Amino acid sequence: MGKGRFEAFSDGVLAIIITIMVLELKVPHGDTLAALAQQWPVFLSYVLSFIYVGIYWNNHHHLLHATSTVTGGMLWANLNLLFWLSLFPFTTGWMGENHFAPLPSAVYGVALLMAALAWWILQTLIVRAQGEDSVLKRALGSDWKGKLSPLLYLAGIVASFYVTGLAQAAYLLAALIWLVPDRRIERALAHEKH
């Protein structure tokens, strides 16, 4: 399979995930601020999940941009990632509809954790296919974000059963560290061209 088809399939699945999430947002019953305020947990859950899907899409784009080959293992690892991301609409809706209750918040964290582990597997297979001395391997470096995020998700899962606000803070913090643009791959590829 060519890289273009690989990217197009992934982009399509991610677009569908976002579409499903937005369709879960319900129109408030009533025309008052009080009616709208009842929807805030669902809306906040949607915003956080939208950010996560956007982060994965952006990083997926950069990772594949640095890839010259697509292997069968990479295809399966990518499907694994897309599977966990496809659970975001369910876990997002469940958490929001239940106002960040402990179990839905923990299950949301499990989906985040499994997506992070799936990302690590995909990234590892892509680096292996490119070679340990590749531009991609050098660009990724120690990957502190990739190591810190699962720890924050684990902390959030545990915190869900004690103080759900701490769980949400852990999930938000993980998203925020990824929102800071990471131009390592772009810089490494630009440097390689010169």
List the predicted regions and their residue ranges.
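Multi-pass alpha-helical transmembrane bundle typical of ion/small-solute transporters
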Residues: 1-194
